[in-house]
């Protein structure tokens, strides 16, 4: 027997000895590992407990998210365990964060059921976030191989088909959320929908927590909302929609509500992130089968995505939701009232809209990603935005986005229709200025003032909200900053 064979045999024998062996010595750490095209890659931000070696922490994460438990088990010998072990292959210190490390882990594709987000997440985020050896842990990014992505449906409709169905091209789509969230009767709710759509919006929207409460059952809301949609469409000659929230206690109830919305002629239905991954995928499949756009409200995401040291980065949620079948997802505004660093938001939007995503560390994109022809998911900008920010919104977010002005429509002093008209005129004048080649970013406020001379609702809105912004420091910011290239 050669010396090399003897060495491999000895290492393998030691690896399977009974008792507790460090994860790194059990095969979960391999700095020489060669990444395969079919591997799933995950990047964790890990803060080990004092005294825990970062390499051992990374190996523990790899082990506990794949095949390991706390001690050696003899049944490992009955499997292709060397193949099925996840491999931690790289550990880097996080810039400007003491005792915190980026841990790169590769998973063999056979560890995951095809097309099942529930199975994927049960491994990747299943129990390692409660692991005592780490003080804090965050899933920052993932890369999915084309072979796995081909087993996922992707967005039910996609950007191109949605624009064709809505007959809206060359500009962002406009929407608003009905306010107040709760308490309106069905008839009053439908009136809000009608006024907003008649004033120039493309969509009105249920909020995340309006389902089927005693003050307004879902059938009332759906009926009156669709009456408003159809009336506004007839008056304006435009295709209109209202996101009818089908979120419910059971899948049977959700299908019942979605079928009712479809039968009423709705072009779009809505779900909340809190319904869970299996329910989201199920509704994605239903939407594809029924030719209905699927809007996802990210209700609950900030409970685990906002803090930088523990939880999960929202870009991972964006990837999972694009895979699972959602056509829309709220992804930040930059200038609104909700968490949103400009670089991070750009990374979210690129994740949802790119056909191939390149590595971009300032935007938090650690892996290149080929999206395997999955359709694009439309980002939704919602929360504390108004027409006075239109030039900033177009500059930051581009055309493939839904701009949701809730309070910025329904809070207009002259009424909902006037608020909608103000937003539509602001959008149209800014897109026109951009298409004419003007410096609409620098001239934005003046462009809006000029348009307001012939649009009373816009003038009123500009006078009311002026340059209101929500300037708070973001908690989730880039770890790597863009720097100028030096001339040598």
UniProtKB/Swiss-Prot annotation:
Gene3D superfamilies recorded: Ribulose bisphosphate carboxylase, large subunit, C-terminal domain, RuBisCO large subunit, N-terminal domain
Residues recorded with modification N6-carboxylysine: 205
One GO term of the biological process aspect: reductive pentose-phosphate cycle
Molecular functions (GO terms): magnesium ion binding; monooxygenase activity; ribulose-bisphosphate carboxylase activity
Compartment(s): Plastid, Chloroplast
Cofactor: Mg(2+)
Residues at which Mg(2+) binds: 205, 207-208
Keyword Metal-binding on entry: yes
Enzyme Commission identifier(s): 4.1.1.39
Main location: plastid
Iron keyword on record: no
InterPro entries: RuBisCO, RuBisCo_large_chain_AS, RuBisCO_lsu_C, RuBisCO_lsu_C_sf, RuBisCO_lsu_fd_N, RuBisCO_lsu_N_sf, RuBisCO_lsuI
This protein's name: Ribulose bisphosphate carboxylase large chain
Source organism (scientific name): Emiliania huxleyi (Coccolithophore)
Phylogenetic classification of the source organism: Eukaryota, Haptista, Haptophyta, Prymnesiophyceae, Isochrysidales
């Amino acid at each position: 027997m050669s010396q090399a064979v003897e060495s491999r045999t000895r290492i393998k024998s030691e690896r399977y000895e009974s008792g507790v062996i460090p994860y790194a010595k059990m095969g979960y750490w391999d700095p020489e590992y060669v990444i395969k095209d079919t591997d799933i890659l995950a990047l964790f931000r890990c803060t080990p407990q004092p005294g825990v070696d970062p390499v051992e922490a990374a190996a523990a994460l790899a082990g506990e998210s794949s095949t390991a438990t706390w001690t050696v088990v003899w049944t490992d010998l009955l499997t292709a365990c060397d193949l099925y072990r996840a491999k931690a292959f790289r550990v880097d210190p996080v810039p400007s964060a003491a005792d915190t490390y980026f841990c790169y882990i590769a998973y063999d594709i056979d560890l995951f059921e095809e097309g099942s987000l529930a199975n994927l997440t049960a491994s990747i985020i299943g129990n390692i976030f409660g692991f005592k050896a780490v003080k804090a842990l965050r899933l920052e990014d993932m890369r999915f191989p084309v072979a796995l992505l081909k087993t996922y449906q992707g967005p039910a409709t996609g950007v191109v088909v949605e624009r064709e169905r809505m007959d809206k091209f060359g500009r962002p789509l406009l929407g608003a959320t009905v306010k107040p969230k709760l308490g309106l009767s069905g008839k009053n709710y439908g009136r809000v929908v009608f006024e907003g759509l008649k004033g120039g919006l493309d969509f009105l929207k249920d909020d995340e927590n309006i389902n089927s409460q005693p003050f307004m059952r879902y059938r009332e809301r759906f009926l009156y909302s669709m009456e408003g949609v159809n009336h506004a469409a007839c008056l304006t000659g435009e295709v209109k929609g209202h996101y009818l929230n089908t979120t419910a206690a059971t899948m049977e109830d959700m299908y019942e509500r979605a079928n009712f919305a479809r039968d009423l002629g709705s072009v779009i239905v809505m779900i909340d992130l809190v319904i869970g991954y299996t329910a989201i995928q199920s509704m994605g499949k239903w939407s594809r089968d029924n030719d209905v756009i699927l809007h996802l409200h990210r209700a609950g995401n900030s409970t685990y995505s906002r803090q930088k040291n523990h939880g999960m980065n929202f870009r991972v949620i964006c990837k999972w939701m694009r895979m699972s079948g959602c056509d829309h997802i709220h992804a930040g505004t930059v200038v609104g009232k909700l968490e949103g660093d400009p670089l991070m938001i750009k990374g979210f939007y690129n994740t949802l809209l790119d056909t191939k995503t390149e590595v971009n560390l300032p935007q938090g994109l650690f892996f290149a990603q080929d999206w395997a022809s999955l359709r694009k998911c439309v980002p939704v900008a919602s929360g504390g935005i108004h027409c006075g920010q239109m030039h900033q919104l177009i500059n930051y977010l581009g055309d493939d986005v839904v701009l949701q002005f809730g309070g910025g429509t329904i809070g207009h002093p002259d009424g909902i229709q006037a608020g909608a008209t103000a937003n539509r005129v602001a959008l149209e004048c800014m897109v026109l200025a951009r298409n004419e080649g003007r410096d609409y970013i620098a001239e934005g406020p003046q462009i809006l003032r000029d348009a307001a001379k012939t649009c009373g609702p816009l003038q009123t809105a500009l006078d009311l909200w002026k340059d209101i912004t929500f300037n708070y420091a973001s908690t989730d910011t880039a770890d790597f900053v863009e720097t100028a290239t030096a001339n040598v």
